[in-house]
Design a protein with these regions (language model features):
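Membrane-topology segments of multi-pass transport proteins
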Residues: 1-21, 25-33, 40-298
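Transmembrane alpha-helix signature in integral membrane proteins
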Residues: 301-325
Length: 326
């Protein structure tokens, strides 16, 4: 009787339903788990973490100053550090702290990150005037603001420099949006129009209808588009001149002063001086920027908008194609 009941249960298809449901549940759990791991590991990247200014004293070497953001800390065996060639004393705790510091200033130092031994950091401070400058190229710059210049002339320094810098960065970002519209939309439309005229002329030529009147009409349209292009080119030249007008002078950890064109600055902020709610607002603005902006620096910085749009569209199209066969 039990054998017949078991056979009937298998024939009813119920085991397949349970197996399919279990497989779907496992897939959903794995997907949620993967998204959770990505969120925990990745979303913290957008938080404006405090910046440190400290002295790094390696035994037997001249000390040097370190400015940057602590990204990661880990406990490593003393012997491991010693075997790596670091001058670690024989006596001491079994484990030492190793910290990954984002020092930025890649155009000056060659590296964005560096590993240091936490026990060798001394005089660690978080001065509120320490700033992070997110640039369109070469990554972040960490240091202190000295002054703001317009056409090479100092217009603000000291305490007045920071609000002036914020106003100039906002102005540059507005100009960048105008430049993007002109270069991608307006010039793109003109190029498309010129290509349409070329193809239409070729079509008339193949059909034997490219007479003097048709040629005159095509040339008239082409001249109109070229005139529009010259006008846009003049506007672009003017915008580029305004875009490159301002600059800032900053001082790095070692006291070296460098000049940064504000046209190359995306954001400038002082995380040590920001309150909790200010940091939360900045965090969500960075997340939105990541989702909506175009990439830059060979897809290593900026946003992911084109990629995420293509991925979502591909998923939807594949779902519509596959579902009828499912």
């Amino acid at each position: 009787m039990k054998q017949n009941s078991l056979n009937g249960w298998f024939k009813s298809g119920a085991p397949g339903v349970w197996m399919s449901g279990g497989a779907v549940s496992i897939a959903v759990i794995m997907t949620i788990g993967l998204l959770a791991v990505i969120a925990v590991r990745g979303l913290g990247h957008f938080w404006p973490a405090d910046l440190i200014h400290a002295s790094y004293d390696v035994p037997g070497q001249a000390n040097h100053l370190v400015v940057g953001e602590v990204v990661q800390k880990e406990q490593v065996p003393r012997e491991r550090l010693k075997s790596a060639g670091l001058p670690v004393p024989d006596q001491g705790p079994e484990f030492m702290t190793r910290e990954l510091i984002k020092v930025g200033n890649r155009d000056l130092n060659g590296n964005d990150f560096t590993w240091i031994v936490g026990e060798w950091l001394t005089n660690q401070k978080t001065p509120p005037e320490l700033m992070a400058v997110e640039r369109r190229e070469w990554g972040n710059f960490y240091g202190y603001l000295v002054n703001v210049k317009q056409d090479g002339k100092v217009i603000a320094e000291g305490e007045a420099a920071w609000p002036e810098l914020q106003a100039r960065v906002a102005r540059v970002n507005e100009l960048a949006a105008q430049l993007k519209t002109l270069e991608k939309s307006d010039i793109g439309a003109i190029n498309a129009g010129l290509e349409r005229i070329r193809l239409h002329g070729r079509k008339l030529e193949l059909a034997g209808k490219l007479d003097a009147t048709a040629q005159a009409d095509l040339e008239s349209e082409r001249a109109e588009l070229n005139a529009r292009y010259q006008d846009i080119e003049a506007r672009l030249a003017d915008l580029h001149a305004q875009f490159n007008r301002d600059s800032l002078t900053a001082r790095d950890a070692n006291g070296k002063e460098i000049v940064i064109d504000i046209g190359k600055v995306v954001h400038a902020y002082q995380p040590n001086a920001m309150g909790t709610f200010t940091k939360i607002g900045f965090y969500f603005s960075k997340v939105w920027e990541f989702l909506s902006d175009d990439p830059r620096e060979a897809n290593t910085e900026g946003g992911i908008f084109p990629a995420i749009f293509g991925t979502v569209m591909m998923t939807l199209i594949m779902a519509m194609i596959v579902t009828p066969f499912g």
